[in-house]
């Protein structure tokens, strides 16, 4: 029975859960930036996080917290470095853990700027307006082509001179029985 418990325990003890890692960006009042490399949800607890500047490992200027339990049987850890604003892309975080087939190399990825979204929306709006105007122009031109360019197939009724008739020219004395026999005077 002891052998069976050891066999079942090995599956738990020998398991490896690779870390889920990402980098966050935090502006400081001093005008520079803190980059923080997070490793979450890993097992076993042994992990190494390092920061590099242009490929050279930083050791002195890095803040590193101890590995902590996450409360779900896995662990978490972070390492941070303070960098000049605008130089964030020169820094990379390396994550070493036995659950990873090879070490991870992470860099802070700035979110897409709202300015680029505004440009995209404006361009799409202009293109949409041009498409609508083009469709209207094409419709009008096609309609004119079909009518010979005269604006329509209208002709006067036979025997009519104009449409300027007055009510006095009408010969009917009544509007008919449907109108209650009202008379024109």
Swiss-Prot record:
Gene3D superfamilies: Immunoglobulins (2.60.40.10). One of its GO terms (cellular component) is lumenal side of endoplasmic reticulum membrane. Residues 19-107 form the Ig-like C1-type domain. It holds the Pfam family C1-set. Glycans are attached at residues 10, 90. Residues 140-185 are cytoplasmic. The keyword Cell inner membrane does not apply. The chain crosses the membrane at residues 119-139. Residues 1-118 are extracellular. Its main location: membrane. One of its GO terms (biological process) is immune response. Keywords: Cell membrane, Glycoprotein, Immunity, Membrane, MHC I, Transmembrane, Transmembrane helix. It is a single-pass membrane protein. The keyword Membrane applies. It is found in: Cell membrane. Involved in the presentation of foreign antigens to the immune system. Belongs to the MHC class I family. Sequences of three cDNA clones that encode portions of three distinct histocompatibility antigen alpha chains are presented. These chains could not be precisely identified. Heterodimer of an alpha chain and a beta chain (beta-2-microglobulin). This is H-2 class I histocompatibility antigen, alpha chain. It comes from Mus musculus.
């Amino acid at each position: 029975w002891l052998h069976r418990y050891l066999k079942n325990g090995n599956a738990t003890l020998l398991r490896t859960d690779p870390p889920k890692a990402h980098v966050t960006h935090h502006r400081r009042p001093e005008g520079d930036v803190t980059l923080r490399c997070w490793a979450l949800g890993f097992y076993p607890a042994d992990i190494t996080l390092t920061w590099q500047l242009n490929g050279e490992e930083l050791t002195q200027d890095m803040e590193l917290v101890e590995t902590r339990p996450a409360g779900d049987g896995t662990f978490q850890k972070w390492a941070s470095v303070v960098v000049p604003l605008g130089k964030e892309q020169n820094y990379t975080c390396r994550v070493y853990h036995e659950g990873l087939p090879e070490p991870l190399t992470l860099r802070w990825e700035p979110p897409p700027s709202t300015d680029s979204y505004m440009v995209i929306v404006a361009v799409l709006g202009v293109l949409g307006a041009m498409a609508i105007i083009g469709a209207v122009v094409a419709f009008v031109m096609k309609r004119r082509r079909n009518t010979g360019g005269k604006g329509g197939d209208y002709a006067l009724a036979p025997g009519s001179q104009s449409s300027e008739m007055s009510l006095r020219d009408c010969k009917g004395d009544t509007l008919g029985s449907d109108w209650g026999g009202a008379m024109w005077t």
